[in-house]
Amino acid sequence: MDQDAFFFERDPEAEGEAPRKQESLSGVIGLLDVVLSYKPTEIGEDRSWLHGIIDNPEENKPSCKADDNNKDRAISTPTQDHRSGEESGISRRTSESKTETHARLLDQQSIHRASRRGTSPNPLPENMGNERNTRIDEDSPNERRHQRSVLTDEDRKMAEDSNKREEDQVEGFPEEIRRSTPLSDDGESRTNNNGRSMETSSTHSTRITDVIINPSPELEDAVLQRNKRRPTIIRRNQTRSERTQNSELHKSTSENSSNLEDHNTKTSPKGLPPKNEESAATPKNNHNHRKTKYTMNNANNNTKSPPTPEHDTTANEEETSNTSVDEMAKLLVSLGVMKSQHEFELSRSASHVFAKRMLKSANYKEMTFNLCGMLISVEKSLENKVEENRTLLKQIQEEINSSRDLHKRFSEYQKEQNSLMMANLSTLHIITDRGGKTGDPSDTTRSPSVFTKGKDNKVKKTRFDPSMEALGGQEFKPDLIREDELRDDIKNPVLEENNNDLQASNASRLIPSTEKHTLHSLKLVIENSPLSRVEKKAYIKSLYKCRTNQEVKNVMELFEEDIDSLTN
């Protein structure tokens, strides 16, 4: 490209306004965009139009009118160039070659638009789609209803459609099939489609047409199968043989689908796609194969086959197994192992479960398997019970040892208590008995003489004096005068020997009778003692009961001990 297109002569009239006006870059950028969009062979034919100077809008009114005729597909580059020429301080010159160059530009722009729309009269713009650096692309079928008016919106939507079309080609299906729109075969739709039928869509680029050359019939079946509606009715009541047959069919269909995948990858003409396309293609292919497998399996399940003798045999086996389980439960209930038949059916212990399975098993292999499981579970349960019994025995032994220790401690404590009780009893025996027996007269040991001490006031000691008889007290009166109360009660033969006459005189005391006078004197001594009144009466009674002098002596010794204890 010549550099003369960028240099312009200045008008001498506009030299005064030059510092205020500047050359706009938008016109230059528009020219560059138009020039670079064509092949260098087309530009090299006639380049004289590049030397033309941008003129006034007054001289280029026919070009604006020519653009108004194409409002549907308006491209604003020539008009923008003329506007930028107005704003800048470009020199205004007139020449005849300007209209010719502008008309040539309009013709080339119409060719460019026709190649974009896919309806060109000559085959040259159709081959322009094979160039990788151009942005010519097919319109998406979603935009057929809306007429385009601006070039920028068209380019942006074409860029989005190119990304979607790359996803379609990675998946292996053409764009029209992916959006599940019906394909039209009549010629009217092809002519009225603005060049967007299947014939023109196959010329995106060499990279995309290589993938869509030979679509296999398996892929077409998979697409049709995927667009079908999923069946929702599934048989619930299936026997065991039907389930096994369905599982085998599922395995066979999965193997066939994997073989079809391998066949399709091997029969592709130009080998495997790049790694990025593989990584993007794997989840979609897996999803499609999952759908096909599910629909094929549901179709196989929904087809009701007539009852075969195999189904009858399995039903008979199930009936016999149920009857055998019921008989087993009745036997266990009758033997007393289980409480009720319902309990055996609902029990979750391992041995019971294996027993029920063994009774329901169809062949010897299952029976031996369940029998082995039952034996192992029984052995395990017995081991658990043995371990429980061992732990219980250990606990019982520990409790016995602890009870022995407690018994030993309690016996020792009991011995200590017994010894203490015996010591207390011995002390009480010494205190109470004083070591003597009262019934045996020959025994010289001391008789019991424990008396309870009252709270009587202590009487002062008074020595006996014969002058006391002259006092007014009854105690100190002589025998002849005072009333002898005790003499009537005491029946002592010693005292009654010479006491025949009751009205004796005072001279009777002078009769020599040792026993009588000694007892009387002892009585006086006891009465004049500082002891309490009850103790005095007790000593006097014991003194009158004495038969021998030794007994009298013992009584007087006890009396002296009591007086010593009081005085000390």
Curated annotation (Swiss-Prot):
Cross-referenced Pfam families? Paramyxo_P (PF01806)
Q: What is this protein called?
A: Phosphoprotein
Where is the region N0 binding? Answer: 33-41
Q: Coiled-coil segments, which residues?
A: 387-416
Gene3D superfamilies documented for this protein: 1.10.287.340, DNA helicase RuvA subunit, C-terminal domain, Viral phosphoprotein oligmorisation site domain
Task: Keywords in alphabetical order, please.
Answer: Coiled coil, Phosphoprotein, Viral RNA replication
Q: What SUPFAM superfamilies does the entry give?
A: Multimerization domain of the phosphoprotein from sendai virus, Phosphoprotein XD domain
Q: Where is this region: Disordered?
A: 1-24, 45-324, 434-455
Its lineage opens with: Viruses, Riboviria, Orthornavirae, Negarnaviricota, Haploviricotina
Protein family according to the UniProt entry? Belongs to the respirovirus P protein family.
Q: Where is this region: Multimerization?
A: 344-411
